[in-house]
Amino acid sequence: MKKTYFIADLHLSENRPHLTHLFCDFMQQLAPQAEALYILGDLFDFWIGDDEESALIHTVQQQIHALSAQGVKCYFQHGNRDFLIGKRFAAACGMTLLPTYQRIALYGESVLLCHGDTLCIDDVAYQQYRKKVHQKWRQWLFLHLPLKVRLKIAEKIRARSKADKKRKSEEIMDVNPDFVLQTFAQFGVKKIIHGHTHRQHIHHIPPHFTRIVLGDWGDTASILEVNEQQQVRFLTGKE
């Protein structure tokens, strides 16, 4: 039976090698069964440019390239941690970069994909930050800094993000329900799949909308499987 997989929020880093092992297991065992794999952002805990080299980056690149070579279409949508992943890395992986919002035909149904951070409009401070860091001139300047400088900046941003997260309420960091309804209408879809909030769940919204939230990866993987009969289930990679 034809199937498609969706993952997000792996936050891969050198400091958490078990996540890389989970990712490799998934890519080698489950992912080859799919027609397509959609990675909806925050594959990495941070990304400072396609020119960075590390054992982790090399491993991830190899895994995605190998899957793509088997005929599985691989797609990537930027997250709030790895929005600087560019064409160079994508090409090396054999994956296609997607815009902030991407509508796809999923076994006869029109579905909207996004990382999910743009739906959290109540977090005003983050939205202001996001607007700044997505300005092309700021990205150009950052990417032309020495790697060591970029790494220090990224570490400071991560530390600040963790501190901010502790201060903010759970409601502010979740999606805005009214904005979600506006997004359904704007893109003419009845189903949205996203990550970012780490709150794995399938929300059924009256009268006929569905919002599927991908989970983050921790002790186990979090994989959404959708098959050609429109059956939906979450997998942990240990099935």
Swiss-Prot record:
Q: Which residues bind Mn(2+) 1?
A: 9, 11, 42, 198
**By what name is this protein known?**
UDP-2,3-diacylglucosamine hydrolase
Q: Could you say which EC number(s) this protein's record lists?
A: 3.6.1.54
Query: Which keywords has UniProt assigned to this entry?
Result: Cell inner membrane, Cell membrane, Hydrolase, Lipid A biosynthesis, Lipid biosynthesis, Lipid metabolism, Manganese, Membrane, Metal-binding
Which organism was this protein described from?
A: Pasteurella multocida (strain Pm70)
Give the location in the cell.
Answer: Cell inner membrane
This chain's function reads:
Hydrolyzes the pyrophosphate bond of UDP-2,3-diacylglucosamine to yield 2,3-diacylglucosamine 1-phosphate (lipid X) and UMP by catalyzing the attack of water at the alpha-P atom. Involved in the biosynthesis of lipid A, a phosphorylated glycolipid that anchors the lipopolysaccharide to the outer membrane of the cell.
Annotated CDD domains? MPP_YbbF-LpxH
Which gene is the coding source of this polypeptide chain? lpxH
**Keyword Oxidoreductase found:** no
The protein's annotated catalytic reaction(s) are: UDP-2-N,3-O-bis[(3R)-3-hydroxytetradecanoyl]-alpha-D-glucosamine + H2O = 2-N,3-O-bis[(3R)-3-hydroxytetradecanoyl]-alpha-D-glucosaminyl 1-phosphate + UMP + 2 H(+)
Cofactor binding, per record: Binds 2 Mn(2+) ions per subunit in a binuclear metal center.
User: InterPro entries given for it?
Assistant: Calcineurin-like_PHP_ApaH (IPR004843), LpxH-like (IPR043461), Metallo-depent_PP-like (IPR029052), UDP-diacylglucosamine_Hdrlase (IPR010138)
The protein's matches in Pfam families, at most eight in alphabetical order, are given as: Metallophos
Q: Name one GO molecular function term.
A: manganese ion binding
Q: Which NCBIfam families match?
A: lipid_A_lpxH, PRK05340.1
| Pathway(s) per entry | Glycolipid biosynthesis; lipid IV(A) biosynthesis; lipid IV(A) from (3R)-3-hydroxytetradecanoyl-[acyl-carrier-protein] and UDP-N-acetyl-alpha-D-glucosamine: step 4/6
Q: State where substrate binds.
A: 80-81, 123, 161, 165, 168, 196
Which protein family is named in the record? Belongs to the LpxH family.
- Cofactors demanded by this protein: Mn(2+)
- Membrane topology qualifier: Peripheral membrane protein
Q: Which residues bind Mn(2+) 2?
A: 42, 80, 115, 196
Its BP terms in the Gene Ontology are: lipid A biosynthetic process
Tree of life domain: Bacteria
One GO term of the cellular component aspect?
A: extrinsic component of plasma membrane
